[in-house]
Amino acid sequence: MSKHLLLAFGALLLASASTASAQNLTEAQARAIIAPWYSLFNVATRGDVKSIQEQVLPTDYESCAGYLPGECWGRDTSIKVVGNFAKSIPDMKFDIKEVLVADDRVVVRGEVTGTPAGELFGVPHTGKSFRMMAIDIQTIRDGKIAKTYHMENWLSALGQLRAK
């Protein structure tokens, strides 16, 4: 009986240690983990999309856009989606405005700017630029971004592109 109690206590200790380490993630540590990811959205100065994503995202990474319930995709699709921004919005920039850390979650409020090179989401090319807010909730696991919930205000961006 004492062997089982000892094992249970050890498991509890291990669980609390991992929770404590997740809770001790500082803003500086969070920024260091997420920085390579956000550098990919600064299209003009980014590096190789695939190698950076493989560095910061585990193979079981999930990206959930939130536009449709349950709409999530994996790392390979994310590499394609992020890679396509260079073609559609060649001057795209992501400016991190705020980072909040809670346990293993990192919330990022950012501003995205850019000028589409052609039609964007059905809006004909106008040569106009847009500025929109983006909110991301990143789950950090083993020093990598394991899951992202993200919402960008594309409605506002498209409205700016359509404006007279």
Task: Show where each model-derived region lies.
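Short acidic-aromatic low-complexity motifs
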Residues: 23-60
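Bacterial N-terminal signal peptides
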Residues: 8-16
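Bacterial N-terminal signal peptides that target proteins for export
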Residues: 1-7
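Exposed beta-sheet edge and beta->alpha loop/turn motif
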Residues: 111-141
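Low-complexity, intrinsically disordered terminal/linker segments enriched in charged
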Residues: 23, 146-164
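A short, structured loop/turn motif at beta-sheet edges
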Residues: 99-107, 139-146
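A solvent-exposed, acidic/Ser-Thr-rich amphipathic alpha-helical stretch
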Residues: 50-103, 111
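Sec/Tat signal peptide C-region and signal peptidase I cleavage site
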Residues: 18-22
